[in-house]
Every structure is written in C-alpha cells, then in structure tokens.
C-alpha cells in the first residue's frame, strides 16, 4: 500500500519517544522467555451502564507494535513500569496491521 512506509516510520518514532512509550517484557502464556517490546500504556477509568446504574472500573490498555509482539493472546503477561499486566480478550489491530491495542488487567 502506498504511503505505508511513511506510517510505519511515524509509528516507529512514536514508540521510540521516551515520553510516550516505555520498555516492556512480553511473556506468551505468562511464562519465560520474556521478549522485549516498547509499549504505550494507558490507564483510565471506564464507565459501563447497566440499566439505570453506572459502574466505573479501572482499565489498562496497551498499544504495541505488531513487529515486536506478533501474536498476543489472552493469558499473556506484559511487565512495564513496575506493573505486571495480564492480557484479556482478543487484541485489535489497526487498519495497517502495525499496532495492536490490547486490554489488560493487573496480575
């Protein structure tokens, strides 16, 4: 796809920026060997509605390059910034298949 290299280069720049991304360790199935990967961690509250009630829960969402974490799946672990996170659910890829968005929960 034309221009894909431009997007890949921009993604690489974002993940190289220490104010945006941090070093992480991915463990498939939660076991060694640990594979290094740069990750963008977002910690935010999520509001869920159930009837007339609203629930607020903490969430952890990682973004990681497909090139560094080719096959994330539920049960994998990611260690970053002193936190150990467990991947839950199926990861979502962006349109160009350059970045995974991965929902996690604390270990």
PLM feature spans:
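Active-site-proximal polar cores
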Residues: 1-31
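Short, conserved turn/kink motifs that form compact alpha/beta structural patches or helix kinks used as
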Residues: 19-107
């Amino acid at each position: 796809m034309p221009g894909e290299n431009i997007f890949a280069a921009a993604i690489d720049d974002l993940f190289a920026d220490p104010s945006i991304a941090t070093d992480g360790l991915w463990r498939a199935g939660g076991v060694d060997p640990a594979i290094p990967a740069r990750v963008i961690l977002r910690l935010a509250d999520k509001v869920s509605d159930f009837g007339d009630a609203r629930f607020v829960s903490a969430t952890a969402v990682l973004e990681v390059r497909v090139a560094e974490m080719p096959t994330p799946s539920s049960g994998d672990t990611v260690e970053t910034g002193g936190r150990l996170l467990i991947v839950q659910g199926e990861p979502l890829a962006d349109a160009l298949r350059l970045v995974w968005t991965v929902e996690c929960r604390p270990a």
